[in-house]
Amino acid sequence: MKTKEMSEAIGVNPTTIQRWTKYFKIDCDVTEQGHFLYTEKHLQLFKKIKRELDEGKRMKDINLNERQGQGEPSVPTKQYEAKLEKMLVQVDALEEKLATKADDVVSYQLLKHRSELDEMMKLVGTLEDRLLFIEKRMMSHHHQEKQVVNEHTPKKIKRGPWRSFMNLFAF
């Protein structure tokens, strides 16, 4: 049924039918030329809209959701449930892959940190060995220096006790 036929059946202008279609977002078929095609369900819907407007309701106060929901669902329930189940299985598989990937990343990071710690421990060991070697060299060098200093220091000349006593009162 075209817009003009629908308007004649209800008793309103064709532009009113078009305005109601857009305002209430009524689903209907559209021809290649852009003309709306309505069914018998649409006729009943438009009659209810006209009746409520005639009763004094404003267009924004008219609720069509309950009336439009009376038809059959667009997808059969069994088909919907099967599709939903398939999607849930896919979501579970993705979650499992994500968990596995996260475990792999953590394992890799732990191995990387462990190898870095091993390298640092080797470096610390090498530095410790070098430090001990340097300390030994310094100690042996220090002992040699002491011996050389002891050999080259002149022995003190002994002076009498009066000389020390006199040095105390020297100005």
From Swiss-Prot:
Source organism, top-level taxon? Bacteria
InterPro entries given in the database record? Chrosome_anchoring_RacA, DNA-bd_dom_put_sf, MerR-type_HTH_dom
GO biological process entries: asymmetric cell division; chromosome condensation; chromosome segregation; regulation of DNA-templated transcription; sporulation resulting in formation of a cellular spore
What would be one Pfam family of this protein?
MerR_1
Q: What are the protein's UniProt keywords?
A: Cell cycle, Cell division, Chromosome partition, Coiled coil, Cytoplasm, DNA-binding, Sporulation
Q: Name one GO cellular component term.
A: cytoplasm
Residue stretches in coiled coil:
77-105
One Gene Ontology term of the molecular function aspect: double-stranded DNA binding
Similarity comment: family membership: Belongs to the RacA family.
Q: Name it.
A: Chromosome-anchoring protein RacA
Which species does this protein come from?
Answer: Shouchella clausii (strain KSM-K16)
Q: Which gene encodes it?
A: racA
